[in-house]
Amino acid sequence: MLDSQEIQAILPHRYPMLLIDRVLSFEPGEFAIARKNVSINEAVFQGHFPGNPVLPGVFILEAMAQTGAVALLTLDQFKGRTAFFGGVKSAKFRRVVRPGDTLEIKVTLEKLKDRIGVGKAIATVDGEKACTAELTFIIE
């Protein structure tokens, strides 16, 4: 398990763009499972949407990417480096995510060649799929 300080030692993201609160489990180069507690205090809800707050899908995708980056950047050969989005395929949004929800995100790495990684990501709320996607990472 990794807390926010340990996550910040791996990822370059900081408030307001560090979107995962805790890593529940991970195996370097294999998978990571993270949690994001969605709070009404997040600035995005001032405009998306007043009176009907909904977490934007791009924030869910970014939280997925950060989760996958933990699985990649904990490999010895990538420690201290940065993982960038290389692409998103087949993103599907299946459930609205609102303040008070807890996203559980799992990213399983399926391919890793040189500095390119591909992973399958799923985000759930209370066991219900909120988003699925295939993510490509580029390590710099």
Curated annotation (Swiss-Prot):
GO terms for biological process: fatty acid biosynthetic process; lipid A biosynthetic process. The lineage of its organism: Bacteria, Bacillati, Bacillota, Bacilli, Lactobacillales. Its EC number is 4.2.1.59. Belongs to the thioester dehydratase family. FabZ subfamily. It catalyses: a (3R)-hydroxyacyl-[ACP] = a (2E)-enoyl-[ACP] + H2O. This is 3-hydroxyacyl-[acyl-carrier-protein] dehydratase FabZ. Involved in unsaturated fatty acids biosynthesis. Catalyzes the dehydration of short chain beta-hydroxyacyl-ACPs and long chain saturated and unsaturated beta-hydroxyacyl-ACPs. It is found in: Cytoplasm. Disulfide bonds: none annotated. The gene is fabZ.
